[in-house]
Curated annotation (Swiss-Prot):
Keywords, ordered alphabetically: Cell inner membrane, Cell membrane, Electron transport, Membrane, Translocase, Transmembrane, Transmembrane helix, Transport
Gene responsible for this protein: rnfE
Protein name per Swiss-Prot or TrEMBL: Ion-translocating oxidoreductase complex subunit E
Name of the top EC class for this enzyme: translocase
Reported function: Part of a membrane-bound complex that couples electron transfer with translocation of ions across the membrane.
Source organism per UniProt: Shewanella sp. (strain MR-4)
UniProt membrane topology term: Multi-pass membrane protein
Amino acid sequence: MTNYREIAWQGLWKNNPGLVQLLGLCPLLAVTATLTNALGLGVATMLVLIGSNILVSLVRDYVPKEIRIPVFVMIIAALVTAVQLLINAYAYGLYLSLGIFLPLIVTNCIIIGRAEAFASRNNAFSAAFDGLMMGLGFTLVLAVLGATREILGQGTLFDGADQLLGPWAKALTIQVWQVDTPFLLAMLPPGAFIVMGLLIALKNVIDKKLKERQPEAAVQPSVTRARITKVS
């Protein structure tokens, strides 16, 4: 029986694709200059993850083992193309901001990794849930990284939200503080490396604290059985 709680725990925290597996670092570090871009890429990746996991799970019994990887890549490429066309049609500004990193979702190791490790071995519903949790975990890391860099770099939050949600979302932009000159280190990839390292360190500290709080298993004393033989 599938343990959905364990799948959620693995995707969101224990085996988070961004903080633990360190997959998808290229777009993660390059696109997360703002929260809007981070959410856009995260949602696109999550949609592809869910769709690819479902399709791989459905065709797993019909694809020969020898050619499964090329077939999985073709499925992922088709889904990425569909998502790319949707973003191009309904969020053109975001499409321009994400640039080459949108089609490069095809090569993201998170997606092919989950297709091979989980979707090809489980039913469609479990595979879809795994894709949702892994995608959500990746999106959360992108969002935290993007929000931190945007606040430090230009003193705003949700800048350009209208590119993702439409003209009404301009009201969501928050001016955290007034910045005369942007903090370039936070806006450029070196700053992303630093913030990402701090997030990984924070997760390791939290994991260590949680492990220390767990009660140690009581040591059961060994019992030696005495054999009694009847003496006549």
